[in-house]
Amino acid sequence: ENIYTLDSKGELLITIMSSLAQEESRSISENVTWGHRKRFADGKVSLPYKRFLGYRKGADGLPEIVPEEAEIVRQIYKQFLEGKSYYAIAKNLTDRGIPTPAGKEQWHIRTIGSILTNEKYKGSALLQKKFTVDFLTKKTKVNEGEVPQYYIEESHPAIISPEEFELVQAEMAKR
């Protein structure tokens, strides 16, 4: 733009242009957020496939089960219901050389806990668990009722039956 920044006119132009750019960024952010919320309200579910064990994006764009990974998820639920701890399950998977959802060698108890508490494995989805607080910093926050959440049942194929999922939740509450 050939702006001379050493005089007051140049500084004023830069200030105005940066304000316009920031406003454009805010507008785009609001439009994207609106689009996400519209999809949620319409019951359309998308999963973080790269870090989500047992599912991949199908040819039609919808979640489909990866049989080998789904079997690992079933084993985790089964072992927990047999009385094994998060640590014992994680150690078993690590010892067997099964990679984590992120592709790492070492399983952690947080990963096991996350799999056991994730409603998506029973074919349902709670959407908007987190939301973006500030479009500039991209800071997110756990949704504690500030924005609407959407719970969609039977939104995609289940790996775990709803009954088994509820048994695991009850067992977790007992422990």
Go through each PLM region and give its residues:
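Conserved catalytic breakage-reunion loop centered on the nucleophilic residue
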Residues: N2-R175
